Amino acid sequence: MLTQLKAKSEGKLAKQICKVVLDHFEKQYSKELGDAWNTVREILTSPSCWQYAVLLNRFNYPFELEKDLHLKGYHTLSQGSLPNYPKSVKCYLSRTPGRIPSERHQIGNLKKYYLLNAASLLPVLALELRDGEKVLDLCAAPGGKSIALLQCACPGYLHCNEYDSLRLRWLRQTLESFIPQPLINVIKVSELDGRKMGDAQPEMFDKVLVDAPCSNDRSWLFSSDSQKASCRISQRRNLPLLQIELLRSAIKALRPGGILVYSTCTLSKAENQDVISEILNSHGNIMPMDIKGIARTCSHDFTFAPTGQECGLLVIPDKGKAWGPMYVAKLKKSWSTGKW
């Protein structure tokens, strides 16, 4: 069952690195990451080094697969060392590159596992979802973090929003593939501009996840069209504004005392720390929450950027720990502004 997909791996190796993007990254990230950029660049440009974690679906638990994973040397994320780590979440990691086959979508049959970059589970764990809570996944497609949220707890209400119509279809299929019908009934899927969610549903949610549209460094680095890649470089400077607007909307949708987690899959300081700094400077009712404990307890599985992350964590790809990029920041809303 754990035969690696050599054809897919070779396909990735055949992809060409986009020199325009790599040069852009080199100029920016060598300054922002310092010496760490050399290793990060090596991993990002070598798909043969990439790793894939296996998140088991508690609604159709694959006991035989779990045995196979143990035999192959896989281990569970954090092995229970994280505070408030849900026992229902089983995510298996391997130190060696490779992946197991993806399962096909079959109507009426729940998938047994979800393949993901292990770092993408950290925003979900940081949210600390509890049974019965109302939660919003503001930018939910393709659905991996929504699936992970439902492995953690059974919310009273889960609102999965995605503005892009093509990605929305992907999101719906993902949910149908992993979640049983009784739980589907507590999930709402919408196609609303995330910047308007706060006005549409003010102070509705206990927890909000904003996995924001971002540069998506891994994918962008292998752009097949250099002209489009160059265009994206100029458009990239507009992303922080969008991210800030999404966060402001999310804050409106969050009840007083509620928790918001912001995440991206880019190394960019402008899209990570600078965005959070702008929110903290412009919202007196928003306070940063310390998540440095995650870095301390997960250091055996992830490498974190050592500096420049005052209000969050940045997972950077490393040898034997090829997870990330993934930025995570956790915020708390202290009181209501009463302005919608």
UniProtKB/Swiss-Prot annotation:
Task: Give the domain of life.
Answer: Eukaryota
Q: Which residues bind S-adenosyl-L-methionine?
A: C139, A140, A141, P142, G143, G144, K145, E162, D193, D211
- Which Gene Ontology CC terms are recorded? mitochondrial large ribosomal subunit; mitochondrial matrix; mitochondrion
- Check the record and name the Gene3D superfamilies matching this protein: 6.20.240.40, Vaccinia Virus protein VP39
Q: Which reaction does it catalyse?
A: cytidine(34) in mitochondrial tRNA + S-adenosyl-L-methionine = 5-methylcytidine(34) in mitochondrial tRNA + S-adenosyl-L-homocysteine + H(+)
Annotated GO biological processes are: regulation of mitochondrial translation; rRNA methylation; tRNA wobble base cytosine methylation
What, per the annotation, is the impact of changing C214A? In C2A; catalytic mutant. Abolishes ability to methylate mt-tRNA(Met)
Compartment(s) of residence: Mitochondrion matrix
Substituting C265A results in: Catalytic mutant. Abolishes ability to methylate mt-tRNA(Met)
* Key words of the record: Disease variant, Methyltransferase, Mitochondrion, Primary mitochondrial disease, RNA-binding, S-adenosyl-L-methionine, Transferase, tRNA-binding
| GO MF annotations, alphabetized | methyltransferase activity; tRNA (cytidine-5-)-methyltransferase activity; tRNA binding
Q: Where is the active site?
A: C265 (nucleophile)
- EC number assigned by the record: 2.1.1.-
The kind of enzyme this is, by top-level EC class, is: transferase
So which disease is it linked with? Combined oxidative phosphorylation deficiency 48: An autosomal recessive, mitochondrial encephalomyopathy characterized by global developmental delay, microcephaly, failure to thrive, hypotonia, muscle weakness, external ophthalmoplegia, and seizures. Laboratory studies show metabolic acidosis, increased serum lactate, and combined oxidative phosphorylation deficiency in skeletal muscle.
Q: Record's PANTHER family?
A: NCL1 YEAST -RELATED NOL1/NOP2/FMU SUN DOMAIN-CONTAINING, TRNA (CYTOSINE(34)-C(5))-METHYLTRANSFERASE, MITOCHONDRIAL
Q: What is the documented function of this protein? A: Mitochondrial tRNA methyltransferase that mediates methylation of cytosine to 5-methylcytosine (m5C) at position 34 of mt-tRNA(Met). mt-tRNA(Met) methylation at cytosine(34) takes place at the wobble position of the anticodon and initiates the formation of 5-formylcytosine (f(5)c) at this position. mt-tRNA(Met) containing the f(5)c modification at the wobble position enables recognition of the AUA codon in addition to the AUG codon, expanding codon recognition in mitochondrial translation.
Q: Which family does it belong to?
A: Belongs to the class I-like SAM-binding methyltransferase superfamily. RsmB/NOP family.
Query: Could you identify this protein by its name?
Result: tRNA (cytosine(34)-C(5))-methyltransferase, mitochondrial
